[in-house]
């Protein structure tokens, strides 16, 4: 900052009575209404440096120019006037007018009243019962790294801030503040307005609730929770295991590092929902309005939760995704990783993809899809014989080629043991109602030595098949795929948790689809 002059007060200092007269463009005066005697400092139209002393009450009129104003422990009265001023008043109960220009105001401790005036101003939060008026412009309330030590709430809608454990303040603390910037590690709760806000937070476990508008939100490290309204957002959740409640359009959202959850509530008026974490985008068809399918860009999210009734298609990525559908008919695909898929209510379609996945259809008639024998052995936790379907899709790793005419067999095999012949024609599904001789990994031991042959002892392979078995001592059934190559090629596709040997007799062809 280029300075035209430096004006320093020569008061009594240390709380003593101020001198009279002038010194270095300073003088004294007494305010009749407050009975406070001020040391007066006056600037010029050029950039000035105006510095008070000790405990003296200082009255500063900076004039135009980009001024530096510093006062200490007195109850000061500061007017920045025009220019981009830096005002630092330290302790004392101060009254500060920033004036026009982009000012930075640090009131220090004390019960201060700050009127930033026109311009894009920054007001630093300090100890004491302050009132901040940002005035015209795009103004920011800034929280320093050591300003707070316990959780704190800032409500831009009501103009109040207070310690989070306490009841909401009934008196407004500030007005005309659009942005919040924090360097603190304390946990903050921020409620913004429907306008354009910029929220930049530190390393605490923060909560941000947006009313809508065109906002930019950066939460930094910590386990943060961000709830968006209807509007256009740029969101960076930073490090930590974060949760984003989405209700936005035309936004760019970066989950950052950590295990992050995308939550979508149907109450925002969405008819259909499509989220692809692998291709990193999201789109909706809202009631009465359609979008082009690229409205929201997603990055580095691991989990998705749908709340309410909205028809959803959710596709995971290579991470270990946790995907939870809502109360409508959902299509959930895990893609890569060891995923957990939960359909919730509705008639859902679940495909774990690669990895060892856990699938729960929830209420409704659900379909569990398998596309490859090399994807890993999944677990279905709630398969219901009366309602649910196992679907097997032809591909190079789950070859069920042939007429596509399914042959379904439910029957007993007296002793399914090593060396047994089991006839499986193309697309044959066999549900065995007699127990296999071993449990647990022993099921694999037995099935991998079974030949799929003609049944005459020659072990001539005639096709691939799906085999459903259970052990007498186990409460679970297992679904295997047996290829044409003979013994040792059976691959476990999934475990049906809670489906017992007795339940296998109730399977029908309707429980299986080969596509």
Predicted regions, residues:
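Extracellular interaction modules
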Residues: 168-176, 292-300, 383-386, 505-507
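Acidic glycine/aspartate-rich repeat arrays in secreted/surface proteins
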Residues: 147-153, 160, 269-272, 367-515
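GD-rich hexapeptide-repeat beta-solenoids
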Residues: 3, 11-49, 56-58, 66, ...
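Short, basic/low-complexity N-terminal boundary segments at the transition from targeting/disordered tails
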Residues: 117-118, 140, 220, 230, ...
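Solenoid scaffold repeats with emphasis on beta-solenoid/beta-helix
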Residues: 39, 48-49, 58, 67, ...
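Glycine-centered beta-turn/loop sites at beta-strand termini
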Residues: 42-43, 52-53, 61-62, 71, ...
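Disulfide-stabilized cysteine-rich extracellular repeat microdomains
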Residues: 46, 55, 65, 74, ...
């Amino acid at each position: 900052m280029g300075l035209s002059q430096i004006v320093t007060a020569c008061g009594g200092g240390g709380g003593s009575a101020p001198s009279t007269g002038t010194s270095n463009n300073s003088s004294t005066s007494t305010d009749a209404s407050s009975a406070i005697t001020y040391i007066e400092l006056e600037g010029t139209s050029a950039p000035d440096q105006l510095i008070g002393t000790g405990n003296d009450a200082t009255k500063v009129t900076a004039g135009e120019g980009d001024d530096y104003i510093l006062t200490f422990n007195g109850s000061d009265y500061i007017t920045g006037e025009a220019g981009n001023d830096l005002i630092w008043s330290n302790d004392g109960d101060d009254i500060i007018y920033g004036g026009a220009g982009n000012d930075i105001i640090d009131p220090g401790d004390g019960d201060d009243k700050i009127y930033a005036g026109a311009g894009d101003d920054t007001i630093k939060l300090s100890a004491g019962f302050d009132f901040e008026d940002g005035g015209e412009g795009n103004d920011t309330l800034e929280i320093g790294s050591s300003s707070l030590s316990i959780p704190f709430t800032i409500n831009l809608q009501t103009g109040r801030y207070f310690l989070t454990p306490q009841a909401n303040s009934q008196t407004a603390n500030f007005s005309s503040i659009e942005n919040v910037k924090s360097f603190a590690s304390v946990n903050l709760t921020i409620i913004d307005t429907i306008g354009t806000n910029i929220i930049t937070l530190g390393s605490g476990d923060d909560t941000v609730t947006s009313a809508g508008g065109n906002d930019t939100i950066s939460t930094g490290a910590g386990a943060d929770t961000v709830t968006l309204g209807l509007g256009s957002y740029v969101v960076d959740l930073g490090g930590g295991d974060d949760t984003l409640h989405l209700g936005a359009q035309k936004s760019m959202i970066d989950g950052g590092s950590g295990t992050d959850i995308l939550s979508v509530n149907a109450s925002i008026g969405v008819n259909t929902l499509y989220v692809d974490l692998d291709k990193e985008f999201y789109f909706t068809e809202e009631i009465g309005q359609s979008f082009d399918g690229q409205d929201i860009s997603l990055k580095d999210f691991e989990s998705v939760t749908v709340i309410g009734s909205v028809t959803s298609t959710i596709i995971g990525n290579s991470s270990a995704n946790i995907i939870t559908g809502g109360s409508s008919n959902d299509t959930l695909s895990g893609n890569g990783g060891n995923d957990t898929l939960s359909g919730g209510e509705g008639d859902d379609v679940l495909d774990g993809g690669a990895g060892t996945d856990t699938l729960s259809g929830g209420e409704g008639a659900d379909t569990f899809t398998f596309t490859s024998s090399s994807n890993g052995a999944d677990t279905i936790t709630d398969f219901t014989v009366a309602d649910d379907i196992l679907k097997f899709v032809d591909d190079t790793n789950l070859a069920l080629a042939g007429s596509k005419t399914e042959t379904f067999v439910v029957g007993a095999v007296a002793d399914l043991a090593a060396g047994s012949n089991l006839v499986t024609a193309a697309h044959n599904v066999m549900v065995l109602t007699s127990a296999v001789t071993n449990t647990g990994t022993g099921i694999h031991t037995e099935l991998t030595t079974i030949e799929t042959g003609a049944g005459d002892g020659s072990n001539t392979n005639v096709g691939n098949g799906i085999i459903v078995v259970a052990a007498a001592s186990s409460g679970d059934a297992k679904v295997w795929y047996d290829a044409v190559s003979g013994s040792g090629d059976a691959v476990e596709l999934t475990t049906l948790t809670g489906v017992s040997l007795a339940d296998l007799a109730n399977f029908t062809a309707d429980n299986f689809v080969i596509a």
